[in-house]
Amino acid sequence: MDIKRTILIAALAVVSYVMVLKWNDDYGQAALPTQNTAASTVAPGLPDGVPAGNNGASADVPSANAESSPAELAPVALSKDLIRVKTDVLELAIDPVGGDIVQLNLPKYPRRQDHPNIPFQLFDNGGERVYLAQSGLTGTDGPDARASGRPLYAAEQKSYQLADGQEQLVVDLKFSDNGVNYIKRFSFKRGEYDLNVSYLIDNQSGQAWSGNMFAQLKRDASGDPSSSTATGTATYLGAALWTASEPYKKVSMKDIDKGSLKENVSGGWVAWLQHYFVTAWIPAKSDNNVVQTRKDSQGNYIIGYTGPVISVPAGGKVETSALLYAGPKIQSKLKELSPGLELTVDYGFLWFIAQPIFWLLQHIHSLLGNWGWSIIVLTMLIKGLFFPLSAASYRSMARMRAVAPKLAALKERFGDDRQKMSQAMMELYKKEKINPLGGCLPILVQMPVFLALYWVLLESVEMRQAPWILWITDLSIKDPFFILPIIMGATMFIQQRLNPTPPDPMQAKVMKMMPIIFTFFFLWFPAGLVLYWVVNNCLSISQQWYITRRIEAATKKAAA
């Protein structure tokens, strides 16, 4: 029966690694960042201008008609004077041509831990990378659908900043055409990564105005600059959207390469996902929108929506708006903004285990203030939850160890007669009340928890650059000196010594190799995950040693 346990452990080791690779196949993005050395070490700033370009190109503005192709627009030069906006959590630049957000930094999230003053950059349109949030008015009279190109807005200032004590900042961009006055308004709130983008349409033209609001996210095929996992596992980089039938529908770059998507959706959201961060347009819940994905002539990927027809009578005024979220994947914040948006924190098929783990881990952290110690306490709680099951398993293993001399005698007695040997072993197990597969139960129980915790550490932005103690400065990446994996291998070896020795020499050799194999796997796993396994092993060793000693003492007493 020991061979079954050996095979099970080996299979679980292989399965766990294959599952990680499978996650990479299903959710990963093979493309790598196309940044030069200078770009990786210099802070991505917000320059005053961007190169002249083809911002009025057809690929930028969707058609208001769901059945037609994107509108063909004449090119127009970009403005060289970007409008810069700074709040306590956002630093961004708006191009007055079209009013697109072409650059956005997150000052609360450093790009690298060793350079805390260099903020992580989400949106960028400076040449190295294309990633921006666009919105406008298209349709019959929409200024973004003009043959002459997208509108050139004017602002009262070139820079805006949320002052100390100020809770809200409003930035107005103005444009007039054919008797219609437009205000594109950006509203920011202190401490918030979502902003309201609204259009105030004042029709003084003497005739009715008709158009549609659109909003979209445009990105090139470059890799994910926020992905720093060292396991060889890439997190999902691609688009996603909400529908009534599918609250979280992913649309990868490969899907967009195969063909455009168009769906009629009431409310919902469209988003672009990357490791730790998400950008999303959230229209009004009551609006019936046409959601679309496509690829433009420059090879950029676009996901967006076009809203319902807006009618403004002569002399009338109308306001329409949408929310834009650009920031970290904070589940509580995302859930407040729109149903299903919190699902962009993708824990995979074990989400039903991962979500309670994260909830508990978050509450522990609120008390301790350190994610490393929180993982240790979480491990102790999980171990306590499965204590009865583990205790039963260790008692079975201890009894196996106690009857080892009897098993050796049976082997000597029956020699190569495996049938009689197996029958005699089963009778002995039954007599001694031993479950030969009992030692496998803790591994079977721990593996789903282990994998769920892996995805919690991989996906939760709260773990990004979270230190523990001493050399562990980031629990979301590998131990830089491989100390924790080596300690884990040592604890596995000690735990193995407490187990009964397999009667077959080949099985014994395989079992001795397991700590080495697991140590090799764990060298590149997140330090937080290895910490969990080390603490779990230490608790298991203590529990197993105590139970084994008690049973051995009872056996000696009975024999006396």
UniProtKB/Swiss-Prot annotation:
Q: Does the keyword Ribosomal protein apply?
A: no
Query: Which keywords accompany this UniProt record?
Result: Cell inner membrane, Cell membrane, Chaperone, Membrane, Protein transport, Transmembrane, Transmembrane helix, Transport
Q: Where in the cell is it found?
A: Cell inner membrane
Give one Pfam hit by family name: 60KD_IMP
Name the membrane topology term.
Answer: Multi-pass membrane protein
* Cell membrane recorded as keyword: yes
Q: What is its main location?
A: membrane
**Which GO terms of the cellular component aspect does the record hold?**
plasma membrane
Query: Which molecular-function annotations from GO does this UniProt entry contain?
Result: membrane insertase activity
Q: Could you give the subunit structure recorded for this chain?
A: Interacts with the Sec translocase complex via SecD. Specifically interacts with transmembrane segments of nascent integral membrane proteins during membrane integration.
Task: Give the record's family classification.
Answer: Belongs to the OXA1/ALB3/YidC family. Type 1 subfamily.
> Any idea what this protein is called?
Membrane protein insertase YidC
Q: Which organism is it from?
A: Pseudomonas putida (strain ATCC 700007 / DSM 6899 / JCM 31910 / BCRC 17059 / LMG 24140 / F1)
Lineage of the native species? Answer: Bacteria, Pseudomonadati, Pseudomonadota, Gammaproteobacteria, Pseudomonadales
Q: What is the gene name?
A: yidC
